[in-house]
Amino acid sequence: MALKQLSSNKCFGGLQKVFEHDSVELKCKMKFAIYLPPKAETGKCPALYWLSGLTCTEQNFITKSGYHQAASEHGLVVIAPDTSPRGCNIKGEDESWDFGTGAGFYLDATEDPWKTNYRMYSYVTEELPQLINANFPVDPQRMSIFGHSMGGHGALICTLKNPGKYKSVSAFAPICNPVLCPWGKKAFSGYLGTDESKWKAYDATHLVKSYPGSQLDILIDQGKDDQFLSDGQLLPDNFIAACTEKKIPVVFRSQEGYDHSYYFIATFITDHIRHHAKYLNA
């Protein structure tokens, strides 16, 4: 599958690149960002996938989070895809910021008119890793995932639905229980239909209750002054309770004074890179 390089910038000895390709799953052109650390010049490196939140593109993380130095030092290839298909000309895809374009919710839609293109779950877990493994110096056996908000939800569900696929997972202010929050209800009813039993297949709090897999070590940072926390969009307490019941360890850090923004992410990103490096470089 042909990759078209759109940009390449040297950063902390490595290269931050952006590529475009024709996605089979999403049936449109997709962009992704990839950071190749200095170590990638001489051998295969672990791959760490970042999933962004609502309204984001592949650009937000690479320009705002300040992750490059830590990724360079730990020798991690970091991949950041877009958050939805683009330019599919589906009626209503650009009408609201929390549904459609920029709001793929990392699921495979089953409802018309979304089901043909809105297959971000399969894109992130299957198509994109296959593309990365085939074209870049990464070790396919060493892969981890993290994300923010909608992308934190994505990172958690991708891990919980695929035991053993990812070595580690972490999240910043994830949407933990989407079947119960306004964002989730809107997205899931649109993409998955009105049968709420189908929604649980993409809800981290429900997935963790039946998680059969190997031991996970989950790291979550949550700003205490996050407006979406107080609005009931994120519901981390429900997820933590479910993890506690299943004896799955979660390090949940409530960060005084921090909000939902990339300033919050930038503050703690090095901790998250370190968390993943511990498992990826083991």
Swiss-Prot record:
Coiled-coil region list: none
Keywords associated with the record: Acetylation, Cytoplasm, Cytoplasmic vesicle, Hydrolase, Serine esterase
Catalytic center residues: S149, D226, H260
Example GO BP: formaldehyde catabolic process
Keyword Hydrolase attributed: yes
NCBIfam families from the UniProt entry: fghA_ester_D
Name of this chain's protein: S-formylglutathione hydrolase
Species this chain originates from: Sus scrofa (Pig)
